[in-house]
Amino acid sequence: PLPPVVKPAFVDTCRAGMTCIEDYGDSTRCGMASFYEALDRTSSSNPEDDGLVRIAVFGDSFIEADIFTADLREMLQKRFGGCGVGFVTITSMTSGYRPTVRHTFGGWSSHAVTDSVYFDKKKQGISGHYFIPREGAYVELRGQSKYASLLDTCQRASIFFYNKDSVYLTARVNRGENKNYSLAPSGDLQKISVEGRIGSVRWTVDRADSTLFYGLAMDGKKGIILDN
């Protein structure tokens, strides 16, 4: 008689032509348990849950200019909610051909971990950059609807910096009226945010002595944020 048929321990449920996200955790699946629980909470009606999951994607040139992450972000935001392109550095070499956000800037001294000289690693942020403004420096992000979905507007726009002295900034949302902000010196990472239905936001540095800037964000208040 023929030997009994042995069922495979794992059956790949990915249909032809699809690449699934693979969990490389151990067999107990404990490594990603908290992440899966956070995804479940995106649909929670509990007011104590903010229902927000932030995912940071680190990679090589395959994620440059959102090549891979644009599709991943769109898929996750359609499934779990959310909007906006997430974190963007103050300046970027790929701003001219990144299709997921319109990014313009001027008046900045940019420093990256890949620089051969004049880079102080003690000053770098999570992206491996820091940016020093000249007077009148500005940076603007504008959503777009021609590439991927849920990127034309966001609900919260933020700018991140570290200031040893007072800092004075101006925010202009949807090319409307300017709103002025001033923050006292701090030893911690600082953030200023504006909220609403935001299609564009422009930040201008009015004065920022001894201040390092790191990046911006266009986020939703619930669902998925995926940073490239």
What is each of the regions a protein language model found here?
Residues P1-F58, F62-N228:
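N-terminal secretory targeting modules
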